Amino acid sequence: MNAATSITQAPVADVELKQLNEATAQRESATNNPNDSSSIDERPIHSALSESQRSALLAVASFAAAISPASTTTYYPAITTLARDLDVSITQINLSISVYQIFQGLAPTVAAALSDRYGRRPVYLGCLFINIAANLGLARQENYTSLMVLRCLQSSSSSGTVALGQAVMDDLVTSEERGKYMAYLTLGLVMGPALGPLIGGLLSQYLGWRAIFWFLMILGGFFFVLTFTFFRETNRSIVGDGSVPPPKWNRSLVQILRKDKLVPNRESLQKKRIGVNPLASVQILCNKENFIVCMYGALLFGGYASVISIFATQLEERYGYSQVQVGLCYLPFGVGSILSRWTAGKMIDWNFKREAEKQGLKIVKNRQQDLSQYDIEKARLTISFPMIFATCGFVVAYGWLMQYNTHVASVLVIVFLIANVFTGVLIANSALLNDLNPGNGAALGAAMNLTRCLMGAGGVAAVTPLINKIGIGYTATATAGVWLAVLPALYVVYSKGYTWRKAALRSSAQGRGEGSRVASPSP
């Protein structure tokens, strides 16, 4: 009110008044027509960094995130050796995998909250430092209790990097490119399961299982140096669109040695969050649309994790393979996942643009579109459904091929296909959740990690007893059956999600209107 009064009372030159009216008209046009081409072109760029800089940052985030799954899968080829050396059962070693995944789900909630408050970079460095210490302890431990405790610490430190990767992507990437960049981010998550067993098999067979943890310690040290040297802060409340310099203590070594040429755009800074809220990820899950999409993705992930975890022991028991041979057989998982960048990733971005054209949403490169009036659920899930059906079919085929001890080549082809289509579902699922929760990448990453890892822990713990009871063929069939039985819940999001969001926006707008009337002083 005071600003309006001062503008009215002050003598304003004709030119200034004309400029003010034009600016007001532009703002009203952008508000009333968020998808109008002129209003979109007026929006600020989302990131001042070049495409190569963004790709490099996401590559570092992706490789850092690979530590978490790599710490799980390098372990698989040594399961039998560990059980023998520590004088425990294979079931107890599998329990250590389940406990690892539980902490893998819980710990990122804290890492996400800290990164929202203090920045992505310092939390990355803290997680990597603790991970180095945990692997040092694991390499020197002598009993099962120490193994369990240190695996929990290892899991807590490494898993934070997964949630941070989602946050970095949200800081840097708009919705139209999310499929491509999500594939880059997913690359680290799938390279761990792909290369981990091979590396673990080689190390455990020729140097012993302790060499696995020495390797992980060295890997963590390498990523610590890489992050310290090259990784720049991306938190938009600290650096805005990337052009605002962070505090000196939060600059990469490259930034310290070489001054940025970017012109600081302080208007791009987002409001800084006060305090640390580790429950932010839980609050995201309180939204019914987020909950359904997250839980279905977690259900898929749980089944996929169980497929990966039993693959090593099945190859050893059914085909008599050595640890190195087992590790090599995991490569199709990685190759299939990597290729999803060019299959599923491109399809997801193509379908986003196709739906945008149908719905009248104009796409402008490096401008974040207003998705409140866009049926984003249709754009993302149209691609997901056929890939989910394909994943179910391939998992059933995998189970029965294993059951009848068919030639290993057929099994490897199937696991390649499983990895390719499953990664595509994962990309679409993550892209939709990022679209539904803009500006909450860290908390969202923690929420996805929480649901996926808890479901994965349950799947890994249950799969071996289930196979022992009914066989791997029926176990795989039951897994696909559960996925299909719950699929209608995801279809509800496809058909009703946009309606839910519009209703929530109307309710929120009405609430703000009522609040402003109540808060206004009486004349």
UniProtKB/Swiss-Prot annotation:
Membrane-crossing segments per the record: 183-203, 211-231, 291-311, 319-339, 381-401, 408-428, 443-463, 470-490
Compositionally biased intervals (Polar residues): 21-38
Membrane-protein topology: Multi-pass membrane protein
Glycosylation positions in this chain: N35, N94, N143, N235, N250
Keyword set, alphabetical order: Glycoprotein, Membrane, Transmembrane, Transmembrane helix, Transport
Compartments reported by the entry: Membrane
Record-linked InterPro entries: MFS, MFS_dom, MFS_trans_sf, Sugar_transporter_CS
Primary subcellular site in the record, as a coarse category: membrane
Gene Ontology CC terms: plasma membrane
Keyword Transmembrane included in the entry's annotation: yes
GO biological process per UniProt: export across plasma membrane; xenobiotic transport
GO molecular function ontology, one term from the record: transmembrane transporter activity
Pfam family, one: MFS_1
Start and end residues of each stretch annotated as Disordered: 19-42
Membership in a protein family: Belongs to the major facilitator superfamily.
Job description of the protein: MFS-type transporter; part of the gene cluster that mediates the biosynthesis of squalestatin S1 (SQS1, also known as zaragozic acid A), a heavily oxidized fungal polyketide that offers potent cholesterol lowering activity by targeting squalene synthase (SS).
UniProt name for this protein: MFS-type transporter R5
Organism from which the protein derives: Phoma sp. (strain ATCC 20986 / MF5453)
Upper classification of the organism: Eukaryota, Fungi, Dikarya, Ascomycota, Pezizomycotina
